[in-house]
Amino acid sequence: MVDVKFEERRFESPGQLQLLDRQEAEEEEEDCFESIDKLISQGINAGDVKKLQDAGIYTCNGLMMHTKKNLTGIKGLSEAKVDKICEAAEKLVNVGYITGSDVLLKRKSVIRITTGSQALDELLGGGIETLQITEAFGEFRSGKTQIAHTLCVSTQLPVSMHGGNGKVAYIDTEGTFRPDRIVPIAERFGMDASAVLDNIIYARAYTYEHQYNLLLALAAKMSEEPFRLLIVDSVIALFRVDFSGRGELAERQQKLAQMLSRLTKIAEEFNVAVYMTNQVIADPGGGMFISDPKKPAGGHVLAHAATVRLMLRKGKGEQRVCKIFDAPNLPESEAVFQITPGGVADAKD
């Protein structure tokens, strides 16, 4: 086990760090959701459960996140069957009112994953949180993808070392993922680079439809193995390519909203952190007193979907500045971090 002093965030590597016991991680996952197979104990036919799984629904929690209209669209499921399935799922999952104390108790399952920079972690209240979407937007070379690469490694640290003790799913829409970049970051954290790469599942998306289908396929993997992070880099790129002009803007925003809804459901269903990067566009209404005004792409649809929004900009040399743009529980503030060969780290004076 690696001796990591998180008070000073200095990562020493006298040994090799591996994921914690697989059985322990799987037991933690079982506490997060109820498997769709448990519907059989409530009198639901095994064949109907298989149809739900074929449609990408693997947990009772995920089932309750679908409308009955969507469920009746699954081949072989009538309205009567859907009603019976939903009634059975409600016996296994509480989807009604709970007290504020219960919400507070549920929040204790939130895991905060270190970014590699103590200053950035403090800005975020401890790190990137599970059960929510964190969006980072900024110009090119502002550090968005570098944070993503560092999180690919830090997520695999034990929870006691400010990690997530889980695997990572990476959906790449711009071709910016570099496995060779992971190697020095893993070495910095004292981890076996080969094992770290094996715990990252990667997919290159080429259209917005492909991107959405990749999200649907994730449910099967996340129901079987302990995942703690989903990265989408970048969330908006393919939508800006596949939809052009004002005539297709309404359809684009509708499809974008559906995909963001899916991301939200994944975060809450499997207790994973969703980190997505976003591009910026020129802001004609930015005002004459702001030099080169820019705003995040995606409009209000994307703004409402992200729980925490981070604005990144270039600093001096390899330094970058992160500002809390929007968050329900964090004050508007800034932190300076640095991009190093070992990933994101605290800035050096």
Swiss-Prot record:
InterPro entries: AAA+_ATPase, Dmc1, DNA_recomb/repair_Rad51_C, DNA_recomb/repair_RecA-like, DNA_repair_Rad51/TF_NusA_a-hlx, P-loop_NTPase, RecA_ATP-bd, RecA_monomer-monomer_interface. It comes from the Eukaryota. One of its GO terms (cellular component) is condensed nuclear chromosome. GO terms for biological process: chromosome organization involved in meiotic cell cycle; DNA recombinase assembly; DNA strand invasion; mitotic recombination; reciprocal meiotic recombination. PROSITE patterns: RECA_2, RECA_3. ATP binds at G138, E139, F140, R141, S142, G143, K144, T145. Keywords: ATP-binding, Cell cycle, DNA-binding, Meiosis, Nucleotide-binding, Nucleus. It is found in: Nucleus. Double stacked ring-shaped homooctamer. May participate in meiotic recombination. Belongs to the RecA family. DMC1 subfamily. This is Meiotic recombination protein DMC1 homolog. The gene is LIM15.
